[in-house]
Amino acid sequence: AVMSLLYIAQRQNNNWIPLAAMKYIAKFLDMPYIKVYEVATFYTMYNLSPVGKFFVQVCTTTPCMIRGANKLVEACKEKISENESELLSDKDCSWMEVECLGACVNAPMMQINDDYYEDLDKEKTLKILDKILKGENPKPGSYRGRVNNEPENSRKTLMDLKNA
């Protein structure tokens, strides 16, 4: 119940969990506040400080790093802030590196609020960030034209080397 209530509290507080919300959850569940705090600080999906209207999470786990996640991080540093978790002056956007978001097959990728942006490179990432900073909603999904997680280059099997 703690994780679900933390998730709800985060949704109700502009994507972060204030201390008052954690204390309320502890009281509601009749458990020590420190236990709620332990859960909130253990999982990276909970934000304990304001993150902005647009919260960009760049996966930097091994599959994404091998495929160029460092270029996505460079784009975030150029467009949003040199430092992770630092809000833009208008408080509209922040970014951070995160552990696996579960879209390894379409690496490298990032999540902005609830949407996944996959098969990215630096140029595509910069364009997406430009759009969100203008208040626009870029199209989520693959930026190589793949549908879901279909193979690239029309490969049908692992042995299909001619299309590799």
What label would you give each PLM region?
Residues 1-164:
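Signature of N-terminal electron-transfer/Fe-S-associated modules in redox systems
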